[in-house]
Regions:
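Glycine/serine-rich phosphate-binding loop and adjoining beta1-alpha1 elements at the start
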Residues: 1-79
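Predominant activation on well-ordered alpha-helical scaffold segments within soluble catalytic domains
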Residues: 3-14, 32-36, 61-69, 97-101, ...
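General beta-strand structural signal in soluble alpha/beta enzymes
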Residues: 19-24, 43-45, 86, 109-112, ...
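Glycine-rich phosphate/diphosphate-binding loop of Rossmann-like nucleotide-binding domains
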Residues: 55-156
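Adenosine-phosphate binding glycine-rich loop
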Residues: 72, 180-289
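Rossmann-like adenosine-cofactor binding region
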Residues: 115-205
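Short, intrinsically disordered C-terminal tails of secreted or membrane-associated proteins
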Residues: 293-297
């Protein structure tokens, strides 16, 4: 039934030539393969058909880790032995935990749809990933305290990663966050009011479209024929640069999302200006192909 529905969706958007589909909550590499089969436009494809499986390799989690590496000094801690809590131990959260563990961080709490698992001395990230990959829940793990899903908000940690659903942190519960850094792994996981409260408390919140862009960057690289190695390189370079740009603005007095939006608007305006210049720089029939190519790349 799911395959039938996804193929029907693909057929419905067949004429939207600029709409390139990628995976998100509820879909995976196999689903993208069905869409590719129907309309020829999809990213995050299975390896078997030449794609880069975004969720399997943890592209978004890698990007989150890059953002955290840049932000750690600003937030006032060292990543090595930093305590991490992850809300939503799925395609994004589990890989973020894996990459952070490789950097010496310690996972002290994680949650999924069944509840929260916590251990102040540290949880075995590899064991939890194996558990989830086998179709079981965090509460099936033999160690750690089993708590309700909401208990993840109270985790004592340096890094609190929302990697589940939108609007999970809001005015009614933001006071429960006890972290120094919140890199947003999910899309819009924090309301604007809650972000402002965090900022006033000195908690650095890295906006979603900065911190969780690893999947989108990887998808764009895949679409243009890049290898996984090149995609990973691009994720690291771009997210580190974007995070640093936001932090530079924050030091100037801006709230993180305000800073990120200022940067995004500036780049969009520059891109639009460059595009207009390319279209109008020479309207004669003798415009060289090299000039057109240069404009296309800018």
């Amino acid at each position: 039934r799911k395959e039938e529905m996804i193929r029907a969706f693909a057929a419905a958007i067949a004429d939207l030539g600029e709409y390139i589909v990628g995976p998100d909550m509820g879909t995976d590499e196999t689903c993208m393969g069905w869409i590719k089969d129907e309309i020829g436009r999809a990213v995050g494809l299975p390896r078997a058909i030449g794609g880069i499986p975004l969720d399997e390799i943890g592209a978004t989690g890698l990007g989150l880790t890059a953002a955290i590496e840049v932000a750690q000094e600003h937030a006032g801690f060292s990543l090595k032995k930093a305590r991490v809590a992850v809300q939503g131990f799925g395609a994004v959260g589990k890989h973020a935990a894996r990459f952070l563990a490789q950097e010496g961080a310690v996972l002290v709490a994680a949650s999924d749809s069944t509840g929260t698992l916590a251990d102040a001395s540290g949880l075995d990230v590899a064991a939890l990933i194996a558990l989830k990959d086998s179709g079981r829940s965090l509460h099936d793990h033999s160690s750690g305290k089993k708590l309700g899903s909401d208990a993840i908000l109270d985790a004592k940690c340096d890094i609190w990663i929302p990697a589940a659903r939108p609007d999970v942190v809001h005015a009614g519960n933001v006071h429960r966050i006890k972290a120094r850094l919140m890199p947003q792994g999910a899309n819009i996981p924090c309301t604007l009011a809650a972000e402002q409260t965090l900022h006033e408390r000195g908690v650095l919140s890295i906006p979603d479209f900065i911190a969780n862009a690893g999947g989108v960057i990887c998808a764009a690289m895949e679409y243009h024929g890049a290898t996984q190695a090149l995609a990973f390189q691009a994720i690291g370079e771009r997210i580190r640069a974007n995070t640093q740009a936001v932090l530079d603005e924050v030091r100037g007095g801006f709230q993180p999302r305000e800073a990120a939006m200022r940067i995004a608007r500036g780049r969009s305006m520059n891109a639009a200006s460059s595009s207009t210049s390319c279209r109008h720089s020479d309207s004669s029939p003798t415009t060289s192909s090299s000039t057109v190519a240069t404009c296309d790349r800018s």
